[in-house]
Every structure is written in structure tokens, then in C-alpha cells.
Swiss-Prot record:
This is Alanine racemase. Gene3D superfamilies: Alanine racemase, Lyase, Ornithine Decarboxylase, Chain A, domain 1. It comes from Haemophilus influenzae (strain ATCC 51907 / DSM 11121 / KW20 / Rd). The modification N6-(pyridoxal phosphate)lysine is found at residue 36. The active site is at 36 (proton acceptor), 256 (proton acceptor). Pfam families: Ala_racemase_C, Ala_racemase_N. GO terms for molecular function: alanine racemase activity; pyridoxal phosphate binding.
Length: 360
């Protein structure tokens, strides 16, 4: 018997392949590769090391993420997409060549007070319609002029904004955001970025000087389609194994609460994967996994360490057989549709108990 527990297999080849497709979409744009949240659950050091020679900058959400990259030998510029949180962190940014977004008056005032060993690169975040972070359109000129005065920052500002509906192709709101962004930056020097994954795929006029690929870099669609439709390949294959195959009689319940009873005699497979590994607990009955060339449905309640699947009465599956929870054979977008949970959330919720294997 050879049983392998929950394992995320991360492919450097797929990662590089996806980056090439992204470059084909926006050949004249620099790439800010978004690796926040442990590179969307894929391993931030591995992803950054794999891509460093082929991107211009990395985007993260927290200073700790940026410092982890620096301590592991990553030398390309790193951008704090939410900006700095504490004034005392500004010298750390300067020493480590970490760039920052500025999106409010508090950050501007902190920069004015800062005593830095060297100037830092600043990107002015502009609220073009997301209404989450960013300075208002009528404040852009003020912030621009104030920032340009400061010896604490490098002379060429960047400009950044974010779409709220890039995946809604029938909406004119994204075009409105593009127009607003172009309008408030047209007479100002500096690189601009507004296109994240949805903008890269669907709004070519938004590509500008820099793009910020996130979820598509990992082979996952930002819409309700699948990445394969855009030529993307899943970077992660999440697998586990059957740890038991049981004969199951018609009418017998399975698992906690007995919420599923079999309508016929069948075989039940027990998979070493549960919510303790980050797989959702409340998945609907029938959510598929991939096993021996076919999809089989989850039945019963997902528990902390295991889930159960209906193999069928005539199945030949054996203990130790590999089960794919999502990946090339079963797109995570399909699992997302069944569960009602975004692919973004599924991919970032895996726990440290899941073994990570990095492959070519």
C-alpha cells in the first residue's frame, strides 16, 4: 500500500507558459507580477524566483511579504499595493528598494515628515470607481504637486488604479474608469497601471505602460469561464489519495449527520482531504473530484481530515489511487461553480498541512 496525503503540485513550466501568454496580450507593457497571499497559495519564493528574470516588478499586499522576498534573494523592485501601514516602516522601504502606493492624506503627511536614507518610488493610487482605496479624482492634482515637491521620493511618480467590474464585459463601467484614469494622468509624467487580470484579458486599451497579472498567472480565469479558454494552464494540481474503499448498502448513511444515504448498493471511497487541509466543509452533494479518468461525486459531509465519494458499484478503484481535487483534469473554476466559492478563495485557503511539491 502506498498512500500519499494532500499535496499541491506546483509547475514552473505552467507558470512560465502563462507568463508568455500574458506578454502576448500586452507586448508593450511592463509586468508587475502580483504575488500577494503567498502567490495566491502557490509559494511566493518559488513563484518569484521562477519569474524574476522575465518580469519588471512584483506586487504584494504587506511589507512582510516584500521582506520575505528580499531575504530569499529576490532583487527586482517590489510594490506595496496597499501602501505602507506604519510611518516607521518608511526607512525599511528605502533600504530594501520597496516601492509604495500612496492613497490617502495620512500617508502623504507621513512622507513629508520622513527622514529617509534614500528616496523611495511612489505610486499615486487614484479612485476611478472602485471606491475602496485611492485619492478622489478632484484631489489628484493636489497630491501630484505635493508629492513632486518631496525630496523623500524619487522624481518620477507612478499612477495606479483598479477596476471593479473588469469581468462584466457588457458593462460600460470599465471603459468609464479607463477614461477617467487617462484624463487625470494625461498631462503628468510617470508610468501608469490600471489593468489587472480582467483588464489584461478583456480591455486592451487599459494595458498602458504596466500591467498587473494576478490570478491568470496561475492559470485561473478571473471570470466564470476556465483558464484553458485563454490558453492558460493551471499551475497547481491539488491531489490526494483514496485511503479506503468500502462496500456500501442501499439506504445506509455516510458521514457526520448522515446527510446522504445511498439510493443503491455502491462503493464509497474515502479521500485523505478535509477542511483541515483547506478544502471547503460545506460543498454541495455532487461536487466532483477526478479519479482514474472520470469525475466522481462527493457525498456526505466533508470532515476535518477526510471526504467521501461515490465510486459506483462496479468501480475498480483501489486504496492508494490518486484523487485530483482540482488541476488540469478538473479546473478549479469548475469546483468554484459547484461550491459557490470563488477560485481566488479556494486557492488561497489551503493550510500548511498540505504538502507542496515544486516540479518543472
Amino acid at each position: 500500500m502506498n498512500v500519499k496525503p494532500a499535496t499541491a503540485k506546483i509547475s514552473s513550466h505552467a507558470l512560465k507558459q502563462n507568463l508568455e501568454i500574458i506578454k502576448q496580450k500586452a507586448p508593450n507593457s511592463k509586468i508587475i507580477a502580483v504575488v500577494k497571499a503567498n502567490a495566491y497559495g502557490h509559494g511566493v519564493v518559488f513563484v518569484a524566483s521562477t519569474l524574476e528574470q522575465n518580469v519588471d516588478c512584483f506586487g504584494v499586499a504587506r511589507l512582510e511579504e516584500a521582506l520575505a522576498l528580499r531575504s530569499n534573494g529576490i532583487t527586482k523592485p517590489i510594490l506595496l499595493l496597499e501602501g505602507f501601514f506604519n510611518e516607521q516602516d518608511l526607512p525599511i522601504l528605502a533600504v530594501n528598494n520597496i516601492e509604495t502606493v500612496v492613497h490617502n492624506h495620512e500617508q502623504l503627511d507621513a512622507l513629508k515628515r520622513a527622514n529617509l536614507p534614500s528616496p523611495i518610488k511612489v505610486w499615486l493610487k487614484i479612485d476611478t470607481g472602485m471606491h475602496r482605496l485611492g485619492v478622489a479624482l478632484d484631489e489628484v492634482d493636489y497630491f501630484y504637486q505635493e508629492l513632486k515637491k518631496l525630496p523623500q521620493i524619487q522624481p518620477h511618480l507612478g499612477f495606479v488604479s483598479h477596476f471593479s467590474r473588469a469581468d462584466e464585459l457588457e458593462s460600460d463601467y470599465t471603459q468609464l474608469q479607463i477614461n477617467r484614469f487617462l484624463s487625470v494622468t494625461k498631462d503628468k509624467q510617470g508610468e501608469r497601471t490600471i489593468a489587472a487580470s480582467g483588464g489584461i484579458l478583456f480591455w486592451p486599451k487599459s494595458h498602458l505602460e504596466c500591467i498587473r497579472p494576478g490570478i491568470i498567472m496561475y492559470g485561473i480565469s478571473p471570470t466564470d469561464t476556465i483558464g484553458k479558454e485563454f490558453g492558460l494552464t493551471p499551475v497547481m494540481n491539488l491531489t490526494s489519495s483514496l485511503i479506503a474503499v468500502r462496500h456500501h448498502k442501499q439506504g445506509d448513511p455516510v458521514g457526520y449527520g448522515g446527510i446522504w444515504t445511498s439510493p443503491r448498493d455502491t462503493k464509497i471511497g474515502v479521500v485523505a482531504m478535509g477542511y483541515g487541509d483547506g478544502y471547503p466543509r460545506d460543498v454541495p452533494e455532487g461536487t466532483p473530484v477526478y479519479l482514474n479518468g472520470r469525475l466522481v461525486p462527493i457525498v456526505g459531509r466533508v470532515s476535518m481530515d477526510m471526504l467521501t465519494v461515490d465510486l459506483g458499484a462496479d468501480s475498480q478503484d483501489l486504496v492508494g489511487d490518486e484523487v485530483i481535487l482540482w488541476g488540469k483534469e478538473l479546473p478549479i473554476e469548475t469546483v468554484a461553480k459547484f461550491t459557490g466559492i470563488l477560485s481566488y478563495e479556494l486557492i488561497t485557503k489551503l493550510t500548511p498541512r498540505v504538502i507542496t511539491e515544486y516540479v518543472d
